């Protein structure tokens, strides 16, 4: 007869399913474990299998596997089964690990907008991740949104004032902007007229403004219209004419003290402060001390046409005077060009016709430089005259400078050379600086002549070209006559000679660097080698001197010829040095051989 057992499954430490089985009491506890696993799998096919760890009685005592079931558990007794879940096997042999938490789902899932779908593999109802959002009207906990509409008073309840929003601009465009601006400006003007009369205890101004006051200040409202946000009229922008108002000139500035009413930014307030009537009067009085930036800004102002013609005429005349002052202030003056002569570089001055050939030779041999200084503090009168060099009419400048020089020369106070030397433009000076001193008549001369045509008169250019041609012809004649060379201390202005004789030091450097020996071009390498070998044989073989007398005479003739053609001494030639090294090496080898023989 089989006994009835009530099984309570504890899987992974949690209470699980409960079921009953009929079991043979003569069987062991180990067989009971196998029976429980098979029954659990048959009852719950969609859940993970269990592996029984231990079986206990009602008092939670552990029971060994060797005991019989009838001895421990009577009929209808409670059996506690401790187990852990094992993964399921798929058809392909792979394991699936299930947990009970992932399988559980609410019964009212459809009411909570969860759609359950049937799994294709094992039929488990899984929760679909797609959820439809409920309508906002059905949400009872919907919070009321705050109203961000700007209020006239920032301290009124139920509204949030945001001073940094776009609507706080002074010239914002909206459907009700005109009415709102009229209201707020009327409040501000009312506050100016009676700052304490209509103010309440909490700081809110009374809004009872009459229509007449708004009409009186219509000019102030029209200047703030968004159609013309950047153009202002000096005469009408601050014209607030009110018979009952005794406010001073700073009344428009007091309207800016409340940004919550006029909603004007710091940049607009700064502009109104800088362009107030008092500031404009002060600016016209101190126009000489204002920097360039303020002058530019004052000339850029564009006045708007107004019905008052007198004010328009005054503004136009003041703008014209401001422009003239700015042009005089920003006039660019060219630096004064002063040409002086010192004794270090060739002079760029043109010699006169009365100079003789001796004076021409002296000017060619001597050296002078042209120093250009742009400091107007040395002589203000002459520098003012010289600053006009860049003007279009340069002939008048030449006449002025020549007359100035003649006047100073009569008084004995002349500090500058004659006008023929002074009237040299920067182009001719740069050309003269780049021109080599020893090549007169080259291409640079023609370039400098062409450049100087714009500033030097034509007569002076003709004289200059004639003198240069005469000087060049004289230098060529002197070169053909073979005149003695001038000393090296003075820089020579003659043409370089085509055939130059190099010095001894230069030849020695060339011989050490490039060629082993400088010899006559007619001698070939083979003849030079044969001559050197014959010379060595003549020196070494003294016994055969009588037999080779003819060859030695030829050798001496060749050596004398070579010595005449080569200015380097024999002892300093590269071939002689190499031969001496070879001889020393041979002697050393012979000495070593002798020592080896002795040993």
Swiss-Prot record:
Subcellular location, principal: cytoplasm
Basic and acidic residues biased stretches: 292-303, 321-333, 402-413, 483-500, 533-542, 558-574
Biased composition (Polar residues): 218-241, 344-354, 390-401, 421-431, 456-480, 501-514
Domain of life: Eukaryota
Changes after translation: Phosphorylated by clp1.
Compositionally biased spans, kind Acidic residues: 307-320, 436-452
The protein's name in its UniProt record: Nucleolar protein dnt1
Origin species: Schizosaccharomyces pombe (strain 972 / ATCC 24843) (Fission yeast)
Lineage: Eukaryota, Fungi, Dikarya, Ascomycota, Taphrinomycotina
